[in-house]
Amino acid sequence: MNENLDLGNLSTIPIAPEGFKSGFVGIIGRPNVGKSTLMNQLIGQKIAITSPVSQTTRNRLQGILTTDKAQIIFVDTPGIHKPHHTLGKIIVKNAKTAINSVDIILLVVDSSVKSGGGDRYIIDLLKTVNQPVILGLNKSDQQTEKYQEIDESYANLIQDHNWPMIKFSALTGDGVETLQNTLIEQLEPGPYYYPPDLITDQPERFIMAELIREQILQLTRQEVPHSVAVTIEKVEESPKITKIFAAINVERSSQKGIIIGQKGNMLKAIGTTAREQIQKLIAGEVFLKLFVKVEPQWRQSNLRLAEFGYRVEE
């Protein structure tokens, strides 16, 4: 398996040379503005799942970028929105906690559309922070001939703040290097927090479960995705193949039927694509067995939320 995804032996952390910079950057914004896509682009490997469905990210996920001059720990936070259930409240609380625990805040917005109330709400939250803030205008590849009008709408939002504004496309990578260099300029001198070859603080099992959930988000109907939690029940490793047994937990029997599909075709499609993604992750052959379980109202149960890995960050 790819050891770069585990914390490994922290004794491998080197002493930082003179002038080396490091720090934590919180990536925040409304749901579905491309925060996770940006994280993957910055790190150079897929560690955060993406989908057209809003509120895809549920847990805080740290991605680690190490260069010769700096180490940046990116904290990909869930989209800040008005919550409608216990899980939603935990998600938003964790995102707000992240704002207060990082060295730099990267506020990502969707520059293919004008600024809106959700952006103003987040900027109001940031009025009292002491950390530097950078406004990132994502989706520059989707801008139309009205881009100047759109850019101006965001510039007006931050006219009372001395925040740099950088345009980029997390999807194509255009402008991301400029963003990275700006972040490094804002960092203070500091140590290595993690070994240089580490790219995330999350264990492989977490990433595996997320890759399975991503395919559910991509392939099932709108009413199913937010009711799904994936848990890795067992992993059996051998020199030739890694066997993974995972449970897909839903709230209603009707959702179980949708996940399984006619003659099991949907579950097969989810498993096939997820297996391909996991094979890329661990650089080896994978056997993936999926089960579907009904856990009524798990999003409202603190016990079930804890069992499925969702907790309030302190």
UniProtKB/Swiss-Prot annotation:
This is GTPase Era. It comes from Crocosphaera subtropica (strain ATCC 51142 / BH68) (Cyanothece sp. (strain ATCC 51142)). GO terms for cellular component: cytosol; plasma membrane. GO terms for biological process: ribosomal small subunit assembly. An essential GTPase that binds both GDP and GTP, with rapid nucleotide exchange. Plays a role in 16S rRNA processing and 30S ribosomal subunit biogenesis and possibly also in cell cycle regulation and energy metabolism. Residues 168-170 are annotated as: G5. SUPFAM superfamilies: P-loop containing nucleoside triphosphate hydrolases, Prokaryotic type KH domain (KH-domain type II). Keywords: Cell inner membrane, Cell membrane, Cytoplasm, GTP-binding, Membrane, Nucleotide-binding, Ribosome biogenesis, RNA-binding, rRNA-binding. Belongs to the TRAFAC class TrmE-Era-EngA-EngB-Septin-like GTPase superfamily. Era GTPase family. Its main location: cytoplasm. The lineage of its organism: Bacteria, Bacillati, Cyanobacteriota, Cyanophyceae, Oscillatoriophycideae. The keyword Cell inner membrane applies.
